[in-house]
Amino acid sequence: DAKGDFSEVSRVLNQTDLLYFSGDDTNILPHLSIGAAGLIGVTANVAAAPYRTIVDAINDNDLATATAAHQALEPLVRAIMTHVPGTVAAKYVLHGLGRIGSPRVRLPLVGPEETEAALIEDDLALVHEIQGLDLTRFRPDRNAAAGGALPKTAGTTRSNG
């Protein structure tokens, strides 16, 4: 679930036997701490290890370790989930890290505008010491990310003018 409605998460966990998986990257720790079974996170595609740490720590009743991992992830989550749709930012970052061949997304999504890309990059500059993530290798390619998945044809993607 990725609605961002904590009271709804609580209701589902209290009133059903459903296994609840958090899909709200910002609230994964709170959801796990009240009984969510796991997570499906966009940001985990960029840095999976801290999420494993959070899940294991919650399962071991070690809130301090889970909280430390959550806090370390905050600027990365902000970079991925705030300025453009998460899939757009995740592909932009993964391509900049050399992990995928193209940052292009399927229409109707389009790559980040210059200002959005700059905001993503500014937030990434605040990320420090996340296990499995080396941002010193980050080389963003704003031109490759522009537009949608189709060639730049009038009416289908952003035009140059």
Predicted regions located by residue number:
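Flexible, glycine/charged-enriched surface loops at secondary-structure junctions
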Residues: L63, T67, V84-A89, I130-R139
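Basic/polar N-terminal segments that are highly enriched at the extreme N-terminus
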Residues: L135-G161
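Flexible C-terminal active-site loop/helix
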Residues: R99-R137, N160
